[in-house]
């Protein structure tokens, strides 16, 4: 190919002519062509690449073709906005006092807003990390009581598999049974929460694995544990095929090999996992599973539907099995079933009995969100008042701008851009405050961990963009539009006076203090309500009691005999469940009504040991034979529910036995104080089922008795960890959460008061 026949790439030449400015195209095109032919004389292949490179190299802002329309206007606008931006930065340094007040106030308020938004974002996006989450549902049962319907996470053990086998809409069923077992590795032994789950657990849920395979639960000899548990027992995480010994309630010790290690459970998970075992293990080694039937309950049942299917597809089949369950269980009868999406379980768990998840009350979340909005509004009004007060120092600037041709629109734009710059600085500072101080403090106060990231990029941009624009407009709109309306003649003649004495300024100042007052009062009302819980009567004296968990009758008798010899012990008693720590719910028949009650199977001295007060009747008497078989003590809530005026001697049916009321105990709190006290029945239970030994110590000797129990335990059950608790600590998690809420409210009150004071200082500083 000759030199004259060699041409540069046509597409590159067209691209050059497309972007290049008409005034420069002749010069630039001539240069690249000259270079092309000069190189072509030496090398016939390289010049084409060189030509493309030169075309791209000249693709610079100054060489790009400008639009014919509004050419001058775009340059002017760009320069104008740039000058406004620079002026905004200069204004921050020039007016140090007002800028500091505004930025600090906004930063603190926005820092609180960022922290609370992170909390709300985490709360309302719980459990959304599961890849198949849109197809996973909790099978929640609505249980019929005498005059109400309760939501239960428990469901019939056979219901899930029956639905799966009877309908092709269901891909997987995952049942979860919970227990607390002793787990040992060498000399390291702890009592741990263990979940028994169906082998399809990892097919439904997307908990990430650190080591091992997701089919580990298909092996009945495998155990799955979390990263934290691996470090706790082995000091490392790569523990595949290592062995752990698990002690079951029947005193069976079974060795399992580690089949998989879970990464730390995601912060967005509402369920807390420590150990997983195949549910077949529960069926083989736990007493409750000896005779599985439709009366047997699963702790929770989750259903994964096939793609394209939904819960309504199995309505007919569900109704069929509800009738089967009702025929099999006359005590606990399902009225209906509600399918709860997995991402709603954590938010509704406060209203679901026996839920696997922990949830805060919606009112608390809404209240915190409202207070955050009030704080941001307070900071905005604080900014407006200080900005209005500082206008007097910029009146001449505004007048001169108008005289030399500046229109109202340009002045509005100037003030809004300056305000946006300041709000942007405040938002950056507030985000740093949230990251460094507020969020870490929040995470130390509550049992949940809120990460410093949003659920999605969309949420991130929406929040920061939305709050910046909202705060900038709310705080800057009034000063910008009102100031731009000033007459330049009056300004330059000194007749335009504007400051905090104007009517609108007074109105805004009033609104600011109303918001401050409302925020502080709301916080104080919340705090007062929390203090009410702190001072609330438990229904019994709880200062000198402690209790120990026992696994069997041998442990109970051995520890009881040792306790009986301790001079610091006033009384002791055994129980199958215990006030404030473990509850057994059941249904009793009162005439034609089925009533859900809390059942306490106790020893003869239980009421005396726990200081439970009788308001009517008598305590259990070991010398009266009927007290061992058919006598029962109920609480005031039971009496009120049944409407009995004379409860003594009344009877009801439970477990095919007619029980007669011999006493009425004063109401006592079995659960956290925001729960209504439920009806309770107490009866003498068989000692072989006792799982708690409750001890009442002499005044001031409770710690000595606790030490005695710890030392005695090593001789009673050397293979089991000691589990002893003080009775006044059974609601400790509730009180800790309550006190943490108080600290947040105290802090928010202080922030509101600080913002109000800063605004007042800013106003005063401009009027002295």
Q: What is each model feature region?
A:
Residues 26, 116-182, 294-302, 306, ...:
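Membrane-proximal extracellular/periplasmic loop immediately following the first transmembrane helix
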Residues 360-364, 448-474, 499-511, 548, ...:
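Conserved transmembrane alpha-helices of multi-pass membrane proteins
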Residues 124-133, 144, 274-287, 349-356, ...:
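Short juxtamembrane loops and helix-capping segments at transmembrane helix boundaries
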Residues 27, 91-124, 502-529, 540, ...:
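Short, strongly hydrophobic transmembrane alpha-helices
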Residues 85, 89-97, 101, 105, ...:
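Intracellular coupling helices
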Residues 115-118, 338, 420-486, 518, ...:
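Small-residue-rich transmembrane alpha-helices
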Residues 198-210, 221-363, 561-737:
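Mid-to-C-terminal secondary-structure elements
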Residues 1-93:
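Negatively charged linear elements and acidic catalytic determinants
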């Amino acid at each position: 190919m000759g030199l004259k026949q060699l041409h540069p790439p046509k597409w590159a030449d067209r691209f050059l002519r497309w972007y290049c400015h008409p005034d420069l195209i002749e010069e630039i095109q001539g240069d690249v062509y000259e270079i092309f032919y000069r190189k072509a004389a030496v090398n016939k292949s390289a010049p084409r690449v060189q030509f493309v490179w030169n075309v791209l190299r000249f693709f610079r802002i100054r060489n790009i073709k400008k639009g014919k329309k509004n050419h001058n206007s775009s340059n002017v606008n760009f320069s104008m906005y740039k000058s406004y931006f620079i002026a905004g930065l200069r204004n921050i340094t020039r007016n140090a006092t007002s800028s500091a007040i505004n930025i600090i106030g906004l930063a603190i308020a926005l820092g609180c807003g960022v922290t609370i938004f992170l909390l709300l974002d985490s709360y309302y996006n719980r459990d959304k990390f599961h890849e198949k989450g849109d197809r996973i549902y909790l099978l929640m049962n609505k249980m019929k009581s005498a005059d109400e319907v309760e939501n239960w996470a428990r469901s019939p053990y056979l219901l899930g598999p029956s639905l799966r086998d009877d309908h092709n809409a269901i891909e997987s069923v995952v049942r979860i049974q919970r227990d607390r077992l002793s787990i040992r590795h060498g000399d390291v032994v702890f009592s741990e929460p263990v979940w028994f789950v169906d082998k399809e657990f990892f097919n439904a849920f997307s908990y990430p694995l650190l080591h091992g395979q997701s089919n580990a639960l298909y092996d009945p000899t495998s155990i799955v544990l979390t990263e934290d548990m691996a470090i706790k027992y082995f000091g490392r995480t790569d523990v595949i095929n290592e062995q752990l010994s698990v002690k079951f309630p029947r005193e069976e010790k079974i060795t399992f090999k580690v089949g998989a290690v879970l990464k730390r459970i995601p912060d967005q998970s509402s369920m807390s996992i420590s150990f997983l075992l195949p549910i077949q293990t529960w069926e083989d080694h736990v007493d409750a599973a000896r005779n599985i039937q439709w009366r047997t309950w699963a702790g929770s049942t989750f259903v994964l539907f096939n793609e394209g299917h939904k819960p309504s597809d199995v309505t007919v089949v569900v109704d069929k099995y509800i009738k089967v369950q009702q025929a099999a269980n006359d005590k606990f009868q399902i009225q209906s079933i509600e399918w709860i999406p997995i991402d709603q379980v954590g938010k509704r768990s406060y209203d679901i009995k026996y839920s696997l998840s922990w949830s805060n009350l919606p009112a608390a979340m809404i209240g915190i969100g409202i207070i955050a909005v009030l704080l941001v509004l307070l900071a905005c009004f604080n900014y407006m008042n200080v900005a209005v007060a500082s206008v007097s120092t910029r009146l001449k600037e505004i007048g001169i701008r108008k005289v030399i041709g500046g229109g109202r629109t340009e002045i509005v734009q100037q003030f809004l851009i300056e305000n946006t710059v300041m709000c942007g600085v405040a938002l950056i500072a507030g985000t740093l405050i949230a990251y460094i101080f507020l969020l870490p403090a929040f995470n130390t106060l509550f049992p949940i961990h809120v990460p410093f990231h949003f659920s999605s990029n969309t949420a991130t941009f929406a929040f920061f963009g939305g709050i910046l624009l909202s705060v900038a407009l709310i705080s800057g709109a009034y000063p910008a539009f009102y100031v731009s309306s000033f007459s330049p003649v009056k300004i330059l003649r000194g007749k335009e006076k504007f400051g905090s004495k104007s009517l609108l300024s007074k109105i805004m100042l009033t609104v600011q203090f109303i918001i401050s007052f409302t925020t502080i009062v709301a916080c104080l009302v919340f705090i007062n309500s929390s203090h009410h819980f702190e001072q609330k009567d438990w229904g019994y004296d709880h200062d000198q009691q402690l209790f120990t968990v026992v696994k069997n009758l041998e442990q109970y008798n051995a520890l009881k005999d040792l306790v009986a010899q301790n001079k610091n012990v006033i009384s002791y008693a055994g129980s199958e469940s215990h006030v404030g720590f473990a509850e057994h719910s059941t249904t009793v028949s009162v005439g034609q009504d089925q009533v859900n009650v809390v059942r306490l199977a106790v020893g003869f001295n239980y009421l005396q040991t726990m200081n439970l007060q009788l308001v009517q009747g008598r305590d259990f008497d070991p010398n009266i034979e009927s007290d061992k078989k058919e006598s029962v003590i109920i609480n005031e809530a039971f009496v009120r529910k049944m409407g009995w005026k004379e409860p003594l001697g009344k009877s009801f049916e439970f477990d095919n036995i007619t029980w007669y009321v011999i006493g009425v105990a004063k109401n006592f709190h079995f659960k956290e104080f925001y729960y209504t006290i439920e009806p309770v029945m107490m009866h003498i239970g068989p000692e072989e089922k006792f799982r708690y030994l409750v001890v009442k110590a002499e005044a001031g000797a409770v710690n000595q008795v606790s030490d005695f129990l710890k030392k005695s335990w090593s001789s009673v059950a050397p293979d089991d960890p000691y589990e002893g608790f003080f009775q006044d600590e059974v609601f400790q998690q509730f009180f800790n959460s309550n006190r943490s809420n108080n600290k947040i409210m105290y802090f928010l009150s202080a922030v509101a008061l600080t913002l109000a004071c800063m605004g007042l200082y800013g106003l005063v500083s401009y009027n002295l």
